[in-house]
Regions:
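Conserved LRR concave beta-strand detector
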Residues: 45, 75-77, 142, 179-181, ...
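Leucine-rich repeat
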Residues: 88-285, 289, 301, 306-309
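Acidic-and-aromatic substrate-binding clefts and catalytic sites of carbohydrate-active enzymes
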Residues: 23, 46-60, 188-190, 216, ...
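A structural motif corresponding to the C-terminal end of an alpha-helix
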Residues: 129-140, 286-290, 321-324, 387-388, ...
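Leucine-rich solenoid repeat modules
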Residues: 14, 298-302, 308-446
Length: 446
């Protein structure tokens, strides 16, 4: 018996239980019967390796001509990987006026806008094709975008979605959209954070990822959102290579109950704004009863351990009042107030952490007072049974590797000063892990 002998019902079950979407696509390409049967399954997940008008225009025509395929699309990744559209595809933008005109007419607000939009589509511009396509996918739940500037068509479409304007005047905007990932198209500058607020307003949104987000306070799409509070169901924000001097206040206060926040501050080629940990603590305080995971550190992918900011080693702020917080990952320099005090810092580490703590990770461990920090960790482990009953893991990261000793050996001075801490962790049943972070790579050391 071959695959061609299997009944349609069994083939559909195989496709439904297949975790690798590429395998489903390969199966659909075996013969015309399989393609006709599995076409809707194939369209549930679309991944453009390289985003270009050739691909966008063909997909847009397809979902307009076949509404059942538009209904099938759940995941759409729009060229977030680095690369370029093949040269053979660049001049081949598909534009069939009779097919596109109803969709453009439904989205445009004036005849002049409609005419300009049609011209932009014919010219093969990515932004107008993206803005036209997205509202055509009513069941889209996961979206990955590579954003450019100024992206005026997409910004306009998002603004209309927030305000319930045409084409969203008869149906709710993006009712199934749960996850959005936005990546900047270049290696400099970044995505203005005000451009991202409209995504937070969609009813099903729960998770937002952003790469190279730069905080701004200008009037982006739907500027009225800048002053609104708790209108978003987003629970998870993950920002890498980001720059935010003021603590992303309007993004964080938009959320009703944030559960996870990850912020990795970028090097200076993206922005020269200061790295100010204290302002993030203030912005996160409204979520002290819901926040479960916090990661806040510097991006050292380029081997830079510092931003050059005068505020980068400031105390993040006390976390004891964050009653749901279970995982904390901070720079060692930010977890204590090192600015004053007889011991070189103010307050004890154990006093700054929440009772629900399960995992504590300290980054750039080598850039603080090693003896003082180890003593604080020893005190933390010593009282863990009573104050932190769920604490199971402590992770230490930094420049800890001794290249001269070979293998993955730790520097002798680090081994000496942490020997007692290791013993205390072992006796308390706490897994103490040591990681060397170097040039964007992380590996275990002992």
């Amino acid at each position: 018996m071959t695959l061609e002998d299997l009944p349609n019902e069994l083939l559909l079950l195989i496709a439904a239980y297949n975790d690798n979407h590429g395998d489903t696509l390969s199966l659909a390409q075996c013969c015309r019967r399989f393609y006709a049967l599995l076409r809707q399954e194939v369209y549930t997940s679309i991944d453009f390796t390289y985003l270009c008008p050739w691909a966008l225009s063909r997909l847009t025509h397809t979902v307009i001509e076949h509404p059942e395929l538009a209904q099938s699309v759940r995941k759409l990744s729009m060229g977030v990987r680095n690369g370029y559209c093949p040269k053979s595809h660049r001049p081949n933008t598909k534009y069939h006026a009779a097919t596109l005109l109803p969709a453009v007419s439904a989205a445009a607000h004036t005849p002049d806008e409609q005419q300009a939009w049609q011209k932009a589509l014919q010219c093969g511009q990515i932004d107008p094709w993206t803005a036209l396509l997205l509202p055509l996918l009513p069941n889209l739940s996961q979206l990955k975008l590579k954003l450019d500037y100024p992206a005026s068509y997409l910004n306009r479409m998002l603004e209309r979605a927030v305000r319930g304007q045409k084409p969203f005047d008869t149906t709710p905007p993006f009712p199934a959209l749960e996850q959005v990932s936005a990546t900047w198209h270049d290696h400099e500058n970044g995505i203005f954070s005000s451009r991202l607020l409209p995504f937070f307003s969609f009813p099903a949104m729960r998770r937002f990822q952003g790469h190279m987000v730069v905080e701004d306070h200008i009037a982006g799409p739907a500027p009225e959102l800048l002053k609104r509070r708790e209108f978003s169901g987003v629970t998870d924000i993950d920002l890498t290579a980001a720059h935010a001097e003021q603590g992303l206040g309007y993004l964080l206060r938009a959320c009703r109950g944030l559960k996870s926040f990850r912020y990795v501050h970028a090097h200076a080629s993206i922005s020269l704004k200061d790295f100010n940990p204290t302002r993030f603590h203030r912005a996160l305080e409204p979520h002290r009863e819901t926040l479960e995971r916090l990661e806040f550190r510097l991006d050292d992918g380029f081997g830079w351990g510092s931003t050059g900011s005068e505020r980068e080693d400031d105390f993040f702020g006390p976390l004891a009042g964050f009653t749901a917080l279970r995982e904390v990952a901070l720079r060692a320099a930010n977890i204590l107030d090192w600015s004053k005090g007889d011991d070189g810092f103010v307050g004890a580490l154990a006093e700054n952490l929440p009772r629900a703590l399960r995992v504590l990770a300290l980054d750039q461990f080598d850039q603080c007072d090693l003896g003082a920090m180890v003593a604080q960790l020893e005190g933390l482990v010593g009282c863990a049974k009573d104050r932190f009953p769920d604490l199971g893991t402590i992770e230490i990261q930094g420049d800890l590797h001794d290249a001269g000793r070979g293998g993955r050996s730790m520097k002798e001075e680090v081994v000496g000063v942490t020997e007692r801490l290791r013993g205390l962790c072992s006796a308390a049943g706490i897994d103490c892990r040591w990681w060397n972070r170097e040039g964007g790579y992380t590996y275990a050391v002992s």
